[in-house]
Amino acid sequence: SLQGLGTGTVVLGIHIAAPGLAIQPGDALDETSRARLSTVYMPGYKITMLPQDVVDAYTLSEGRAVPAVSLYVTLDEATLEVKASETKLERVPIAANLRHDQLDALVTEAWLSGADVSNENTAQRLPIQREQLSFLYRLALHLKAQRERVRGKPETFNRPDYNFKLVDHDGSVPTGDEQVAITTRQRGAPLDLIVAEAMILANSTWGEWLKSLSVPAIYRSQASLLPGIKVRMGAKALPHAGIGVPSYAWSTSPLRRYVDLVNQWQIIAAARHGKTAALAAPFKPKDAQLFAIISAFDAAYSAYNAHQGSMERFWTLHYLRQQGITELTASLIK
């Protein structure tokens, strides 16, 4: 959400679904999500971390008011300097969901700058004004440039994301005989960048906030960009060289990653109790449970990603067979 555009001071709202307001550590839903640790994705199907009716109840779907953990960031409209941030637990009315697959062709750099008016009739039906999206895109570019200065080199999006879709599939477990369509989506498109930078801003801001309150959280860190230096998960707020932020706590996907749900519980405690949050948070400093969760999540997440990769390879080979492709032209780089 965006408030104050044109006044010189803008308030950006980043609103995250809040299952952590209802699910409590140790209850039945916590046990279910802790057993699965993450939603598992594969072409045409997914196994959700939480029961589907719980996901449906808390997801930020348009046309209703839903519980949210909201981060409000106050910015200077001209310089984009962050002046303040505040976290609120609230019910947020969702006016509209903007979807990449429907809008990437319309929301381009040229359209945001006003240079492209070819889709003006379609744009008039958008539930958000071009001026708002233009500001969000300018902010996203600014945040990305700031991170790249810390990284020491720019991020590149040379490889597209591949989307796999099973044609006319009803969402049931695939048999392997379905017709598959494979499309590409170039990373770094305006909507993609706006969402990505907002999530990074939330994860890094909340990570630093929890650190300042001595509230434990699960962080991702990377010591440097040197070859062989991997991203690690731990309970210490350390810099993430790959992203270019002083600390990074996954907190923006609590419906599909258990680490984010754990961090959301800690954020909720911080929002409710402020400076005494460390005493009220579910997980205390050096909590053995926190380290057990990190270990279990690391193993499960790696296995799930490997499974997703295997399934995508299967459907890629299936696609080649369906299309009758027997020969490909390639470039070999030694």
Each model region followed by its residue ranges:
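Electropositive polyanion-binding surfaces
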Residues: 1-334
